[in-house]
Amino acid sequence: FLTMWDHCCGWEEEFRHFRPEPSAVRPWTGYVQPYTDTPLNRETVGQSVYLNMISKARKYIYITTPYLVIDVATNTALCNAAKAGVDVRIITPHIPDKRYVFEVTRAHYPPLLEAGVRIYEYTPGFIHAKNFVVDDRFATVGTVNLDYRSLFLHFECGVLLQNNSQVTVLRDDVRDTLLKCREVQVSDCHTGLLGTVLDSVLRLLSPLM
């Protein structure tokens, strides 16, 4: 937020006084690494964190995201993980906040489902969480949606956890959330020639989302 604020205002503010004093930092297990992502450079930090976590998975990948409007690299990484035997589960909303983005999200389901990725829609309402949990070892929570705007155009931030006690807390939260979801089947997606063409057109619109 401060990076965006300074950019819009033309300032160069000193951020160090916002950071806690060393004496205020409590002992903790594992690692907690905050990160930021900005469109002001060519480094897509948010996407790099996600792809790195996917590549390290050997047992499971749990993802919660309000939007699933992904690029080829992320789609390929998730499909390859599922094909390699990793339990890949993605939670998205069943009740959308934006109907057109919801349709584009669903257009991304078929290739993932066919590769073995399991997709769940949260039925009680809209879900806005953005997190990854991998193998009880890694987790990230932040503002980074799985869509083009968030990954490539917006100012975002998050925190990466490794071998930290909160990783399993997040895992348990995802598993509890899965109990409130309906699992999506291939038969729930657009079928036939018209449906396939419609999904292809919607995926072409992904960079605008």
List each language-model region with its residue ranges:
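Charged, low-complexity intrinsically disordered terminal segments
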Residues: 1-209
